[in-house]
Amino acid sequence: VTCRPPGQALIKLIEAAAYALDVSEHSVSVVRLDVLPLDEVHELARVVAGWLRNAGFIEPNTRLDAMWQPSLWMPGREWRTAVEAVRWLDAFEKTANNGVDVERERSAHHPVENLEVAACGLCGSVLPDEVYFETLEIWLDKGEPEIECSRCQSRALIGDWPAEFGFAVGSPAVRFNNWPSLRGSFVNELRRQLGGRTFVVKAHT
């Protein structure tokens, strides 16, 4: 029996299967932290969605499905320019729940299984777990708390404490569901479009 190398179609099928098995649900949300009047939140969400659409990163979802494709936006013609190059890009287009949500309602954005405690931006001292976790409830109920570092006594709003996998509360927010890693330049421009103070939440379930 002569073994021949697999054709390109089979290679793509294998890569797609490997991608589906290897990748769990994940998302990246870019959140505006500053509290804005509701009408300004809605207008900013409209403007940011318009920028994403006009640039070709997203387009209206023509395959809406409550279970498989629930987002109002789907990847647009230029989505590849927003992400890092990986071998399974073709598989991404066939992935369930790979849309984009532009959220107007103020809510908590949590990294779930990725959660790591924030550290002081000046001295690097890590917040005690219980202090960091308590700030989320305070943030939701009363507004963003200011925290003092126990080591260097510097104070900063919790959203300004560096955390690679931290949480955030705010609006509007843009969430990319199950996308490949976003390019830093794209994220920076999106943060500029949102304006003010922003936070990037990387969730994994």
Task: Label each PLM-derived region with a short phrase.
Residues 126, 155:
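Cys/His-rich metal-chelating microdomains
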Residues 129-130, 158-159:
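Short, non-ligating residues that shape and space the ligands of small metal-coordination modules
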